[in-house]
Amino acid sequence: MPLWVFFFVILTLSNSSHCSPPPPLTLRMRRYADAIFTNSYRKVLGQLSARKLLQDIMSRQQGESNQERGARARLGRQVDSMWAEQKQMELESILVALLQKHSRNSQG
């Protein structure tokens, strides 16, 4: 027998004795089903995380726009108040001028 055949037979016999037999079909099917479930579960968790992230971003943007609207409303009230005060001061100065003119006319 050639030497290489002898080594081949020895390697074949030694490899088959150390290898465990393949798991039964039911165990492989169970593992396959577990892998499918795990992958699907990861996808669902990823989708939920993405959805929550989008909702957080949208609520932050909405909160910022509400703050901007509130700031604009406050600014509008301040401008209205300043405008009203300015008009009141102008009216007071007109009334004072009219009263002074009237008092000069009545004295003179």
Swiss-Prot record:
Positions in coiled-coil regions: none
GO molecular function: growth hormone-releasing hormone activity; growth hormone-releasing hormone receptor binding; neuropeptide hormone activity; peptide hormone receptor binding
Compartments reported by the entry: Secreted
GO cellular component labels: extracellular region; extracellular space; perikaryon; terminal bouton
Chief location category: secreted
Stored InterPro entries: Glucagon_GIP_secretin_VIP, VIP/GHRH-like
Use in biotechnology or industry: Can be used for targeted secretion inhibition. A construct with this protein's ligand domain inserted between the C.botulinum neurotoxin type D (BoNT/D, botD) light chain and translocation domains, when injected into rats, leads to decreased growth hormone production. The GHRH ligand domain binds to the GHRH receptor on somatotrophs where it is taken up into endosomes. There the translocation domain inserts into the membrane, releasing the light chain which cleaves synaptobrevin and inhibits growth hormone exocytosis.
Annotated family: Belongs to the glucagon family.
Functional summary from the UniProt entry: GRF is released by the hypothalamus and acts on the adenohypophyse to stimulate the secretion of growth hormone.
Name the UniProt record assigns to this protein: Somatoliberin
Species this protein is from: Homo sapiens (Human)
Gene that this sequence comes from: GHRH
